Amino acid sequence: ILSDMRALAPDCIVADSMAIWGKLIAQKLGIPFVSSTTTFAFNRYSAGMMKQSPVRFLRMLCSMPKIGREIKRLQAAGYSVKNVLDIIQNDDSTDTIVYTSPEFQPYSDTFSADHYAFVGPSVRPAETRMEKPRQPLVYISLGTVVNDHPSFYRQCIAALADSPCRVILSVGEQVSPADLGALSQNVEAHSQVDQIAVLQVADVFLTHCGMNSVNEALYFGVPLVMFPQTPEQGGVCTRVLQLGAGVKLEKPDAV
């Protein structure tokens, strides 16, 4: 990559915050770098919101020797890396674009206004148009990655069957709607839907708390019922709770 970048001779590199090689190569070439951050900006203050389970923490500790070896390899190649935090943590000297608002970003006042731009989410137009139903609309989705939870979907279906609500489930590609059993007349299940179109008319969104989904729901003013699946999603959930924009399901059977 470094040889390719030298041949390209860019004036600036803009890279996702998780594409750590972008920042390292910019430093190596002595050119400006801009970090593009699609999650919350991460520093020692906001880190506490990304709560790790004991199992995840143990896995992280077990991986530390390998991380240490990789850092030493980078240092030997002339890259300026002190420790793992240099790689994963935002700093006050890097120009950074964050795709959320300062109101939603935890501890936004601890990030340098000279280097951080909280520009808000970029919400695309809906591909289709939905009419607002007469009855309240409940939208349920666990996103596109960690969504293989047919038992959870069945619990939602059972809880909301024959209720005075219309229910739309987006179950992803890992679960077939046909495997969810018989649906009552007020419930429909799909592998995917136009989420923007649904959120424009939804009254409640049961979500996994992915950053994109939450940003879109907040944009359209839809209250959230949250069922986070990962530490990052747990951090988003915590922030939504702090702002009073949603409630959390503590257990799957709490639906």
Label each PLM-derived region with a short phrase:
Residues 39, 173, 230:
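Residues in the short beta-alpha loop(s) of Rossmann-like NAD(P)-binding domains
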Residues 118, 141, 170, 208, ...:
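Short glycine/serine/threonine-biased micro-segments
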Residues 120, 171, 191:
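Short loop/edge segments at beta-strand edges and connector loops
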